[in-house]
Design a protein with these regions (language model features):
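An extended, acidic
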Residues: 1-106
Length: 106
């Protein structure tokens, strides 16, 4: 699933080519509108990955705990640990998708 950063529509020109590239390599995209819900969907196996730019720490902190407890991966788009003190571009996924998704995001 993905988040489209609706508060910064000017970034669509940069984001949509990334979404398109990933979409062409996967079954489908979903958008619930909730970062925490999407991360929980990855944790329970309904989704394999979730990406979104510019999330606030309260948008991804709880989902990070849940997903990691389920064996998932949460990184920023540089492949680093999120700071939890600032907005981050978040990748949340099952471990086997981490490398390929990071290549798309870098």
């Amino acid at each position: 699933s993905y988040g489209s950063t609706p508060y910064k529509k000017e970034e669509a020109r940069n984001l949509f080519p990334i979404f398109y590239s990933i979409f062409m390599k996967c079954g489908d995209f979903r958008r619930t509108g909730s970062a925490e819900l999407d991360m929980c969907y990855v944790a329970c196996g309904r989704e394999h990955g979730y990406i979104e730019r510019d999330l606030k720490p309260w948008d991804y902190s709880a989902g990070t705990v849940i997903l990691r407890e389920a064996g998932g991966v949460v990184k920023n788009w540089k492949g680093e640990e999120p700071s939890y003190l600032k907005n981050e571009d978040i990748l949340a996924c099952v471990p086997q998708f981490e490398e390929n998704l990071l290549k798309e995001l870098l």
